[in-house]
């Protein structure tokens, strides 16, 4: 029986990994063994950071809301508590957008929160 070397299958598999490793520095985009390890690690980073992105954005929104709230003489925690007491159902993403792009609307929400706290 003839020996099967599997050249095309191996070449296709290696080509696929090296294509995924495009743009990596050093041997990581040239050598198959190193590229394979780096591609696997990259998938792990991507998986982890897709979950981490959610908390990163939440932290960014809170920082923006806090900065805008302190300009209006109220802390972030007091603002959120006041909005909850006033039954204003606005999430942090929307609040941060208002704080950056529409200062007047944000000021109106701050006034609503202050009235609810008083």
Swiss-Prot record:
Q: Name one GO cellular component term.
A: ribonucleoprotein complex
Question: Which molecular function terms from Gene Ontology are attached?
Answer: rRNA binding; structural constituent of ribosome
Task: Tell me if rRNA-binding is a UniProt keyword of this record.
Answer: yes
Record's PROSITE patterns? RIBOSOMAL_L20
Q: Pfam families given for it?
A: Ribosomal_L20 (PF00453)
| Any single biological process term in GO | ribosomal large subunit assembly
**Alphabetic keyword roster:** Ribonucleoprotein, Ribosomal protein, RNA-binding, rRNA-binding
What does the sequence similarity comment in the record state about its family? Belongs to the bacterial ribosomal protein bL20 family.
Q: In UniProt terms, what function does this protein have?
A: Binds directly to 23S ribosomal RNA and is necessary for the in vitro assembly process of the 50S ribosomal subunit. It is not involved in the protein synthesizing functions of that subunit.
Matching entries from PANTHER family are given as:
39S RIBOSOMAL PROTEIN L20
Name-wise, this protein is Large ribosomal subunit protein bL20
Q: What is the lineage of its organism?
A: Bacteria, Bacillati, Bacillota, Bacilli, Lactobacillales
- Quick one: which gene encodes this? rplT
């Amino acid at each position: 029986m003839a020996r099967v070397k599997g050249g095309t299958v191996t070449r296709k598999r290696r080509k696929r990994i090296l294509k995924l490793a495009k743009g990596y520095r050093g041997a990581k985009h040239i050598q198959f063994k190193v590229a394979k390890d780096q591609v696997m690690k990259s998938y792990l980073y991507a998986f982890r950071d897709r979950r981490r992105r959610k908390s990163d954005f939440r932290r960014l929104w809170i920082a923006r809301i806090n900065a805008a709230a302190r300009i209006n003489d109220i802390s972030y925690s007091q603002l959120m508590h006041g909005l909850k007491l006033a039954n204003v159902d606005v999430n942090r993403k929307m609040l941060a957008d208002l704080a950056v792009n529409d200062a007047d609307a944000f000021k109106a929400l701050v006034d609503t929160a202050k009235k609810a706290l008083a």
